[in-house]
Design a protein with these regions (language model features):
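Short, basic/aromatic recognition patches
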Residues: 1-20
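Short beta-strand segments
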Residues: 16-53, 59, 69-72, 83
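Non-catalytic surface loops within mature trypsin-like serine protease
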Residues: 41, 52, 73, 93-95, ...
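Structural motif
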Residues: 43-45, 66, 90, 144
Length: 174
């Protein structure tokens, strides 16, 4: 579905440094986590990660794959007038090759957050922090995507033009 979205929405997925990732826990309560999204234009999914040492996000997404991503804060994205984008989708937790996930995370994080390079421990010591660098990837396949522009005054949407909603053909998310 992402390839059929407007380029500006795809740019939000690629450029934003954080997204609010929401899962539903075993008691039916929503839990929201700020995570860094990883996306390449045209990919079928938007990916987020969690450290192997902090698996709750992945466990909740595995138990109830209906998740959402809210792209609301463009800070650091270089997009001054970015729309806010809500993605409701289906999660797939990738824990098949943890070593490949660790390498991918290290590579992608340095591209997305180049300033983090100075904060990384030296490579030989990174193994001591495997609980953090070893990653579970959560692939979110959008089922419904909505975008709207926030008003400049206090973030209020009062008086803002209606947003756009895109739904994968023949699918319901609820």
């Amino acid at each position: 579905m992402t390839a059929s979205l407007p380029p500006e929405v795809q740019q939000v997925f690629n450029s934003f440094l954080t997204t609010e990732f929401t899962t539903v826990d075993s008691r039916g309560r929503p839990i929201c986590w700020p995570l860094t999204p990883y996306y390449d234009q045209g990919d079928p999914c938007i990916d987020v990660t969690t450290a192997l040492g902090y698996p709750k996000k992945a466990e909740d997404a595995r138990a109830n794959p209906k998740v959402s991503l809210l792209f609301s804060d463009p800070t650091g994205s270089g997009m001054d007038d970015a729309p806010q984008v809500l993605v409701q989708g289906t999660a797939d937790v990738d824990a098949q090759d943890l070593e490949a996930n660790r390498k991918r995370y290290t590579r992608e994080a340095l591209v997305k957050l180049p300033g983090s390079k100075d904060l990384l421990p030296p490579k030989p010591l990174q193994r001591l922090f495997s609980f953090y660098f070893t990653r579970l990837y959560i692939h979110v396949r959008p089922e419904r995507t909505s975008s709207m522009r926030a008003s400049k005054s206090c973030g209020s949407r009062v008086g803002s033009p209606p947003g756009q909603t895109y739904t994968r053909s023949g699918r319901t998310w609820m």
